[in-house]
Amino acid sequence: MNTRVLRNLALPLALVAICGFFAFKEPAFLGPRNLTQLVVEFSMIGTLALGMFLILLTGQIDLSVGSGVGLIGGIAAVLVFQHDWPAPLALGAGLAAALVLWSLMGGLIVSQRIPSFIITLGGLLVFKGLFWLVIDNSTIPVSRGDEENLYSLLTTYYLPSSVGLALAGLVAAVLALLSFRARAARRAHRLGVPPVARAVGGWLGWAVALVGAVVLFNGFRGVPVSLLVLAATAAGVFFLTRHTPFGRYLYAIGGNQEAALLSGIPVNRVLIGAFMLMGVAVALTGFMTTAFSGASTTTVGDLMELDAIAACVIGGTALRGGRGTVSGVILGALIMTALLNGMTLLAVAPEIKFIARGAVLALAVWMDVRLGRG
């Protein structure tokens, strides 16, 4: 069987199997409350994984993102809670810090020809130390008392029911338009066009799934705003990788960096740009993860780099670069989130969680090596 077909079948089946197992062990797993919680967690892992996807496409890796999530979230929390900065300004400062730090790392990698593994491993330790210094090894809330601000609302705000349904309808309409344009483009280039019935059936499936998901979320509090952050990030990364020269350069560099350089691609600038975008993903994830915790603590971001890498590789992104899709990353992140959420719901011991995460990461790398040969 073709390896692409095998992977495409394996991922949905793995997700169904994981969800089925946890639902059998604990029916509340598929309840509105837990699914909403799962989606918030998925938004955090998925956003970080999308940033990691851009790095892995070029054949690089970033081991510093977990510590960076804690550091950037901590910077914003300190500015809000200890220095009375308005939340939007504090979040902007955190984003600026992330852009500076990740552009510096990217610059070091390309200017000094140091492997990204080494630079980002150092970043992991440096950022962790800076994080603990920034929060002074204490707990820093993201807001004062019971007051709400933009920071705290990142994972606690839910769309009103009517807005969620309207948004689902809008997304369904956009999908229909994109499908129509894709068919028109294939017809214009005299390529094979799938039957109308298949296209309409596929669109109806997505539309029903979208409305069903919103109805399910409305059974608790509504669609979490963090899901919109993930959706916007995914849409941006999809457009970047599929419809811009920068995205094509990422694939080319990962496929063969020497050939990319000889063909005139500005390899150094593209790599620095990829790391800067990784910094944006780290900042967004840091804000959401810290808000989800309610405060910046020394454990925020722990091991998230491994979850992001595993999500990418499970979804078909090659560690050697040059191969991967946004949809695969999203599916890989969903599998990782379902696994972690289910273990938490079943009150699995922390040591078993570590073993499971390590096993999943090892399996993901094995899949990359074995299936990548096909």
Predicted regions and their residues:
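Loop-to-transmembrane alpha-helix initiation sites
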Residues: 41, 116, 143-146, 161-170, ...
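Inter-helical junctions in multi-pass inner-membrane proteins, predominant
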Residues: 25-37, 132-136, 214-228, 238-243, ...
